[in-house]
UniProtKB/Swiss-Prot annotation:
Family listed: Belongs to the TRAFAC class myosin-kinesin ATPase superfamily. Kinesin family. Kinesin subfamily.
GO cellular component terms attached to this protein's record: cytoplasm; microtubule
All copies of domain Kinesin motor, residue ranges: 6-329
Organism: Gibberella moniliformis
The protein's name in its UniProt record: Kinesin heavy chain
Comp. bias (Basic and acidic residues): 432-456
Keyword annotations: ATP-binding, Coiled coil, Cytoplasm, Cytoskeleton, Microtubule, Motor protein, Nucleotide-binding
Amino acid sequence: MSSANSIKVVARFRPQNKVELESGGKPIVSFDGEDTCTVASKEAQGSFTFDRVFDMGCKQQDIFDFSIRSTVDDILNGYNGTVFAYGQTGAGKSYTMMGTNIDDDEGRGIIPRIVEQIFASIMSSPGTIEYTVRVSYMEIYMERIRDLLAPQNDNLPVHEEKNRGVYVKGLLEIYVSSVQEVYEVMRRGGNARAVAATNMNQESSRSHSIFVITITQKNVETGSAKSGQLFLVDLAGSEKVGKTGASGQTLEEAKKINKSLSALGMVINALTDGKSSHIPYRDSKLTRILQESLGGNSRTTLIINCSPSSYNDAETLGTLRFGMRAKSIKNKAKVNAELSPAELKSLLKKAQGQVTNFESYISSLEGEIQMWRAGEAVPKERWATPLTTDAVARTKADARTSTRPSTPSLISDSRSETPAISDRAGTPSLPLDKDEREEFLRRENELQDQISEKESQAASAEKQLRETKEELAYLKDHDSKVGKENEKLTTEVNEFKMQLERLTFESKEAQITMDALKEANSELTTELDEVKQQLLDVKMSAKESGAALDEKEKRKAEKMAKMMAGFDLGGEVFSENERHIAETIEKVDSLHELSATGDNIAPDEFKALKARLVETQGIVRQAELSMYSTSSSESDSRRRQELEARLEAVQAEYEEILTRNLGPEDIEEVKARLENAFANRQTAQSQFVEELKEDIAQKAAENTRMKTLIEDLQQRVKAGATAPMANGKTIQQQIAEFDVMKKSLMRDLQNRCERVVELEISLDETREQYNNVLRSSNNRAQQKKMAFLERNLEQLTQVQRQLVEQNSALKKEVAIAERKLIARNERIQSLESLLQDSQEKMAAANHKYVQLAAVKERLELAKAGSTRGLNSPGGFSFANAGSRIAKPLRGGGGGNDAPSIPTIQNLQGQNEGNTSSGSSSKRASWFFTKS
């Protein structure tokens, strides 16, 4: 079941690209046949022979038909297969493997054509064979295995077990049932692959990609099963930094790529030189994964992609030499098959027969040995017949066949990480015992897991370190900005503080000024109250003085009435005199007119005229009296002024005595002053009495004179009566003069009477005051009591002043304390409001944190679901369609009644039918469906 075969090597040359043409590159490759090419470069010249050589004008279909179609048939027959694409960067490896577009019939590459060929072969196979197809997609980037279908798994470990061989632990495998599903997997994985632009390739692959297709087939009639695994490897190209211009991360990627390719070359050299006892598969994860493809259980095809230009002649020669070395590798491929029950029964019968033969042979040998040990000689004819060499060899071969571990099938284990691989045939290995090898593999797997874990931790630590450095740089920049802003704000704050201090100082000054104004206002208010009280007192005293003045005026009026009554010259008499004089003048005029006309005058009229003349005589007497009083009015006024001055002096002395505290030594002085004043007043009054007597004598003389004058006037009137015409006007004039004189005399008389009355009243008041002073000066006990009360009053006044000052000071302190209390309350309120705002902000932040944590958890779940499921836009989802549920495919070539291959449309139709019927979402296999 195993066969030794060499690696198939195919060379492909691409046309010159734009970079090579611009650099002056020329073709240096010539093709001598379908399998030979000749290179003529400056460094070396020579011919290279491979299984097939394709020139620059070859098509994708030609390469597939010659190189790959047979590999697909081998996979379906139960062999393992591998297809390599090797070459320098930009040589066309990805184009060869994937093509320009997987939906383009002409431009698509090897992998899409392999997929179509696999499903076409399944459809053309007998209907008794059931197939399951699984795919996985990974890349080796920076010596880390990354699952392209679950990109979050970026550091998967490589394990090796006795029954499973080498596999990648944790690699996602997806069951597919149609070409479109495989294409969707390829698209998703290709989008996640690491690429970058270099000077030689705008889309240079920065990793080795490995697309694995595992096909398991089972004959439903006989129960036999076979499995095949196909590795489709797109290697990253070797690079020269001088040509690619790689730098930074691209340069690090180039280093890792060249290192892994060097490890691949070392493995090929060790396999082909025939001298190496150790094959360095573990030097690189690429060679570790492809261990069975290089000298193991696999049929391998190597496609070397080369440039025909002289610009890359060194790289082309290196690639061709690599292909020549790889062509010398010998693989031992065998079918990965599981025996059917009938075959197992046949093997069991053979084993049972062999066991019977061995048991009889062992028993005969044991009997012979016992006889020999007993010292007996066994006859030669009784010796045990030895088994023939062919029989022994056949028995050993059968034993190896029977003890060969079978390839695990998906029927028994549908959740295996990678397909099982049977024992490798002839792969160089360490000379270890069976138990030691198992322990070594177990220990190696543990170490690989630890290495992967440590690498993941190191990668995460490096990532955190980069993020921390970026954050540190950002924080430094932010810190510098914040420092500058802080300095600016500090300057502004200092300015604001100065302004605040200035405003505070001004506020304090204004407050002090306001307090001073308040104090002044309070003092003025107090003074105003005192003035109001004084005004009230003055009003009261004014009322009292007004009452006294009214009383004085009343007394004055009474005395004036009495004095004027003695003269009997009231206003009514005076008016009557005027009336009589006027009537007399009129009567004289009328008599004169009668006498002029010659009429007779009656005697009665003369009598009446006589009476009126007598009255006129009295009026003339009064006029003379008034004239006399006018002559003495000046002396009266001078005397009145002297009396008023003396009265004012006495009142001033009296007020001084009242305002001054009288002591015992002042009483005699007061008495002397009062005696002097009283003596002076008596002298003045006696003088005034003498003057009044003289005035009375003068008045009597004047009265006599006036009487004489009246008599004279009466005589003149009589004479005038006899001659009225001559003296008529003279009388009228005299009457008018008398009238004026009368008025002036009456005014002077009234004024004199008023002065006399006022002097009498002042004299009475002075007497009363004098008597009061005498009474008060005689009471020494009252004076002592008054002095004691005054001293107490002064002490009480001082105490009251101190209390008022203390009260004002306490009021100020209370006001200050109230201000401080108000400010403290305002501060407490502001702090409480700030605390409430802070609590609200903290609650909002906690709420936002909870929401953010929930969103983060949902995002992680969504990422996990998207990476694990890889939902396709066409309605196919790896998760929803059951990517890890086996999808058996029945061959379609057995008859017309064979079921068709499940496709996306069929899956969608089944899902819709299940949804509408309300049945379980678990899809049933058509293997159990009866037509």
